[in-house]
UniProtKB/Swiss-Prot annotation:
Record keywords, A-Z: Glycoprotein, Hydrolase, Lipid degradation, Lipid metabolism, Lysosome, Signal
Cellular localization per UniProt: Lysosome lumen
Protein's recorded name: Lipase lipl-4
GO-annotated cellular components: cytoplasm; lysosomal lumen; lysosome
Location of the active site: S177 (nucleophile), D352 (charge relay system), H384 (charge relay system)
InterPro entries the record matches: AB_hydrolase_fold, AB_hydrolase_lipase, Lipase_euk
One annotated GO molecular function: triacylglycerol lipase activity
Family of this protein: Belongs to the AB hydrolase superfamily. Lipase family.
The organism's taxonomic lineage, starting at the top: Eukaryota, Metazoa, Ecdysozoa, Nematoda, Chromadorea
Length: 411
């Protein structure tokens, strides 16, 4: 009898769990399952996909929203429109710019304003996990790069493709987080590149991260050095690549009950700052279905070095490799004082735990020429991700950028 009851329980408990999951799980938004091009189409916008190859062989995928949701007229097609290039941050993708409803998402807001919108994807993420000869699943060399190479190779390849297809000579660049750091580095090391950038809008701009708060501060202090040594010893590898398993975990945790959804939101906020009424907790399952989108462990090690050393050092590969690459034992520092000829607009917040005011004061505010910085916008009560996912980011950030571009384009 006891054996029969035990057998019955063995069958019934899994069935009860399945029934509970099916009856009480919340419906997940459609965008949970869609990739970026599919998501753009689902909102009624046109989308185009392009590939570009970097000088070191990485194949990067670009997503273009050529027009707004309204059907373009023949004059719209024939007339040149402002080209705006949007570049995501660390472990992110082109999804970030279309993550919310059209009136809240930068990609859609700019398209509806009449701009030719391009969304970039850095090497190693969901959409740019390709190379002319290296296999990301078999060749460790595929992952042997830091954000130095992203700045040196990815930005010119992607922006060059956008200019080639659009027929323009220069464009408006909007970067978020790592998308700002890499552009600052590019402009400081390649002054001629400034000819391709009409204006540069930096959201949650990164100079140094020595004074970061939250979980990143804890991890950097207690595990940063060990992580750097591990990467130096064992080599770089894929870091937090997107996977079907992770999506399922997100769906059946963050997307299951309101309490778990709130828990997932709280975990996210430990890294970036506090929430407010402009933080859409109900979208967390969708955000986490697309983020993290993958990168190289060398990039994380490089960020750890920035936290440890201060300033903006190039990647420290160890004395022997540093001597070969840089001609000196220690990695040289980037210097932003020489950036010229590109009007820069900074959008930042005192409440951002990754792009802190103290770090901005010690790097970007201190080094950038005052004539180059034509706007510095302090946004109240914004954490790091509010700049791309905040429900009022359109009014606080994107509409400001739109006004600046339209005024510039009409002069």
């Amino acid at each position: 009898m006891r054996e029969s009851i035990s057998d019955l329980m063995t069958v019934m408990i899994p069935l009860l769990i399945i029934l509970l999951l099916s009856n009480y799980s919340k419906s997940v938004d459609l965008e949970f399952y869609l990739d970026t091009p599919e998501l753009i189409k689902s909102w009624g916008y046109s989308v185009e996909i392009y590939n570009t190859t970097t000088k070191d062989g990485f194949i990067l995928e670009l997503h273009r929203i050529p027009y707004g949701r309204e059907v373009p007229t023949s004059s719209d097609v024939n007339n040149s429109r402002p080209v705006i290039f949007l570049q995501h941050g660390f472990l992110c993708s082109s999804f970030d710019w279309v993550a919310n409803s059209p009136h809240q998402s930068a990609g859609f807001v700019f398209a509806d304003a009449g701009f030719d919108v391009w969304l970039g994807n850095f090497r190693g993420n969901t959409y740019s996990r390709k190379h002319v000869s290296l296999n990301p699943d078999k060749d460790p060399k595929f992952w042997d790069w830091s954000w130095d190479q992203i700045s040196e190779y990815d930005l010119p390849a992607m922006i060059g493709k956008a200019l080639e297809i659009s027929g323009q000579e220069s464009l408006y660049y909007t970067g978020f987080s790592l998308g700002t750091l890499t552009m600052f580095a590019k402009l400081s090391t390649d002054p001629k590149f400034s000819r391709k950038i009409k204006k540069y809008f930096a959201l949650a701009p990164i100079g140094s991260i020595k004074h970061a708060h939250g979980v990143f501060l804890f991890l950097g202090r207690h595990f940063g050095k060990d992580y750097e040594e591990y990467v130096k010893k064992h080599g770089s590898d894929e870091l937090f690549g997107s996977s079907l398993l992770f999506k399922k975990i997100v769906k059946y945790t963050c997307g299951l009950f309101d309490t778990l959804e709130e828990f997932c939101s709280d975990i996210t906020l430990l890294f970036i700052g506090t929430a407010n009424e402009n933080w859409n907790q109900t979208r967390i399952p969708v955000y986490l279905a697309h983020t993290p989108a993958g990168s190289s462990s060398n990039v994380m090690a490089h960020l750890d070095q920035m936290f440890s050393y201060g300033g903006v050092p190039t990647f420290d590969m160890g004395e022997e490799k540093n001597l070969k690459a840089y001609g000196q034992k220690l990695p040289p520092q980037y210097n932003f004082t020489g950036i010229a000829d590109v009007p820069i607009y900074l959008f930042w917040s005192d409440d951002d735990w990754l792009s802190t005011k103290q770090d901005l004061e010690e790097t970007l505010f201190a080094q950038l020429n005052s004539q180059v910085v034509q706007g510095s916008f302090r946004i109240e009560n914004y954490n790091h991700l509010h700049f791309i996912w905040g429900t009022n980011a359109a009014s606080q950030v994107y509409n400001v950028i739109t006004g600046i571009i339209l005024q510039d384009d009409n002069t």
